[in-house]
């Protein structure tokens, strides 16, 4: 599972990522470096749990919001939309999030994640 998200401050989402990692799911997380420096960011929680994490310092703003993961043995699925992984997005904002199970779309998202991951060694 790969996660590219601009802002990650929702403790429940961070906990779910950590639980997946603890179950042996191969997880990598990429966040925006400016947002990661926020006192509310959960980057340090993920780091402490051993989740591979990189902060994007190579683009103006890493404003992506997507997850690519296995869809219970049915191939890859992409979750994407306007939703940042924040409490405000979950509780206050008008946001959207969609699940895509088109394999060619999932491969494109995965390729973009790999490109950004490699840029931010």
Segments predicted by a language model, with ranges:
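Glycine- and other small-residue-rich loops at beta-strand/loop junctions that grip anionic moieties
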Residues: 5-6
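PLD/PLD-like phosphodiesterase catalytic module centered on the HKD motif
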Residues: 10-121
């Amino acid at each position: 599972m790969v996660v590219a998200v601009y802002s990650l401050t929702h403790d429940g989402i961070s906990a779910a990522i950590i639980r997946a990692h603890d179950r042996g799911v191969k997880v990598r997380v990429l966040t925006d470096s400016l947002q990661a420096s926020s006192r509310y960011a959960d980057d340090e929680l993920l780091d402490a749990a051993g989740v591979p994490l990189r902060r994007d310092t190579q683009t103006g703003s890493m404003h992506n919001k997507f997850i690519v993961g296995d869809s219970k043995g049915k191939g890859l699925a992409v979750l994407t939309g306007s939703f940042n992984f924040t409490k405000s997005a979950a509780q206050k904002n008008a946001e959207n999030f969609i699940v895509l199970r088109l394999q060619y779309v999932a491969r494109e998202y995965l390729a973009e994640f790999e490109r950004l991951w490699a840029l931010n060694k």
